[in-house]
């Protein structure tokens, strides 16, 4: 487990799940709720009105926290650490029944009978009914406020596009279409991708980003003409795409997994049916200032509308049903 608390908010070691915990906890606290996060933080500490509690200490002392509501982050076993009648599990995967058993979720699930919280339409449809028998609710995430508040460039030149998701999220699909159908038609444009990845001889104009803190990502998105991201069956929300949206970067995708939920086709980006369409739409955004400006303006209209404060309020509605 990652050792973190809210002081690590912009650290490169954190992924979307961890930053979501930080933002959700702090915004629940801002709504005047006593909020505790039990995780692998190094020590017990109160930060921004949130109590961070070391999970190893709780397990060692065999104590249980008394609370009104408990929300387990993907692992129903952590519900053993609390005393409450209202229990939820925030699902971060499709989790087929076989994996559910293998991960040791069946026994605590049957003991605690939690409602499952999923992240969107794709997740809701594909989450097994068998392991959602005590109820299933949908809660859409959002991004950190820094992506909403950053001052944008008035115009982004056509010199850079970006893929800022994990390499195992179908980066190979993107590189195939980039090398075969895109890069030779825009030789002055570089594609930024995330590590780990070893460049090959066939790769053209590809730059592997250095992962430091999220402020570097902020700058890379600010200077990117478009985000090229195929999507993946394991993508349930895709924070990378949402970060691009909040930075008003148009997206080209195949719509795999939840990606069709992040893009309004031909309004804030393009959903391609095949490689030829993916290449065409990418080149349209790179080369046609009119298309790029139209989509950029559409993104600006919705920028900053869904904050973590709103997400926290939506969560409270789910809890109070």
Residue ranges and their predicted role:
Residues 250-253, 263:
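Short hydrophobic beta-strand element within catalytic cores of glycosyltransferases
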Residues 122-123, 138-151, 197-199:
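Short beta-strand->alpha-helix junction loop in the catalytic core
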Residues 154-207:
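Conserved catalytic-core segment of nucleotide-activated headgroup transferases in glycan assembly
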Residues 273, 290-319:
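A charged, aromatic-enriched C-terminal amphipathic alpha-helix characteristic of glycosyltransferases
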Residues 172, 218, 241-246, 260-261:
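Short alpha-helical segment that forms part of, or immediately flanks, the ligand-binding pocket
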Residues 222-236, 249:
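Acidic donor-binding loop of glycosyltransferase active sites
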Residues 265-276, 284-289:
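Conserved acidic donor-binding segment of nucleotide-sugar-dependent glycosyltransferases
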Residues 98-102, 112-136, 148:
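A short, active-site helix/loop in glycosyltransferases that binds the activated sugar's phosphate group
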